């Protein structure tokens, strides 16, 4: 049985000194006991609009000077189905949604998902995609939480873009799919490649809307386990963002680390009840990834017992691979964070790049 992590957000032990900085004890399960500090932006850059964290959520933007290019998104992969590349002529696309009733290529007649795959995307298109192998051992279905690198299938972060396109695979105009889009994911960090590598391949695919919450991605790429280029179809299910606070508002936060001196890059994205991060160093071949999930209801207080159950206390780290520190727990203190704020841990300085609130 895999050991369960009991680290929760309340172990961050946030303090608010008089100098308008606050300290957060680092996650004891992911680094040493050193403090990290947050410095808010200067008064010239901090926002005081009604949409700022801690204020009524009348709109979805903290930084009123920047308009969103999209919406926050939470996606869980339901399955991946591999096909030959290139596809034989006249192969129906999408293909996997018809299996096993219609299977002209005589491929495996079942759909499977060997990983726990979650993608979090911000309104400006910054995303973190983490894919962790499910355990083959009975009773170990949960993602790894003790740094087991062998359980990391793939993790990457960057910018996603999407544009309308036409169905390229259906010849009969009457049968062509509508509302198809072409998406591209540019990898700024990739667990399979060194930082700044020019060998990271183009990651793109056509997105076919299946129903109100599911989208099928059709594309192709190199499959390490097959050691070959393969066509793939992935079914993605959208998950609604949930409120984690007593106000009932929903949050999205993006943190970024880019330090050329130390050869460090990192991205943390929180959307609603999920948070994921990835960090890598030029000096290391491997990266660190984390996933956190909110467990419980809205933040609540129990003054009669002299205790308070805060939002931060209800977050739990559900997956971790690697040994670097990731400031995921900082995103749980949205009432303090502002765009442009700086989070320092030892030599590394993270920036609050996006911060959103909506109803």
Where do the language-model regions lie?
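Lipid interaction determinants
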Residues: 2-155, 165-359
């Amino acid at each position: 049985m895999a050991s369960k992590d009991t680290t929760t957000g309340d172990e961050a032990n946030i303090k608010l000194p008089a100098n308008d900085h606050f300290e957060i004890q680092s996650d004891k399960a992911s680094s040493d006991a050193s403090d990290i500090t947050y410095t808010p932006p200067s008064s010239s850059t901090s926002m005081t609009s009604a949409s700022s964290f801690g204020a009524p959520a009348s709109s979805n933007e903290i930084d009123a000077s920047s308009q969103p290019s999209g919406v926050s998104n939470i996606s869980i992969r339901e399955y991946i189905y591999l096909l030959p590349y290139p596809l034989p002529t006249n192969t129906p696309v999408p293909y996997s949604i018809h299996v096993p009733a219609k299977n002209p290529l005589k491929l495996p007649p079942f759909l499977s998902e060997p990983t726990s795959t979650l993608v979090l995307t911000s309104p400006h298109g910054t995303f973190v995609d983490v894919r962790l192998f499910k355990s083959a051992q009975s009773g170990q279905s949960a993602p790894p939480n003790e740094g087991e690198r062998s359980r990391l299938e793939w993790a990457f972060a960057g910018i996603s873009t999407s544009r309308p396109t036409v169905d390229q695979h259906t010849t009969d105009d009457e049968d062509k799919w509508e509302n198809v889009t072409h998406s591209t994911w540019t990898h700024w960090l990739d667990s399979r490649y060194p930082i700044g590598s020019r060998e990271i391949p183009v990651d793109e695919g056509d997105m076919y809307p299946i129903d109100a919450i599911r989208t099928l991605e059709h594309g192709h790429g190199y499959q390490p386990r097959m050691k070959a280029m393969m066509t793939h179809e992935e079914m993605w299910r959208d998950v609604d963002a949930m409120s984690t606070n007593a106000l009932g508002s929903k949050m999205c936060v993006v943190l970024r680390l880019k330090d050329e001196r130390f050869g460090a890059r990192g991205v943390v994205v929180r959307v609603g009840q999920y948070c994921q991060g990835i960090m890598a160093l030029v000096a290391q071949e491997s990266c660190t990834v984390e996933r956190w999930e909110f467990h419980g209801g809205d933040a609540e207080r129990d003054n009669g017992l002299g205790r308070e159950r805060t939002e931060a206390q209800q977050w739990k780290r559900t997956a971790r691979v690697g040994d670097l520190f990731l400031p995921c727990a900082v995103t749980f203190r949205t009432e303090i964070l502002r765009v442009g704020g700086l989070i320092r841990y030892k030599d590394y300085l993270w920036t609050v790049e996006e911060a959103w609130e909506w109803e």
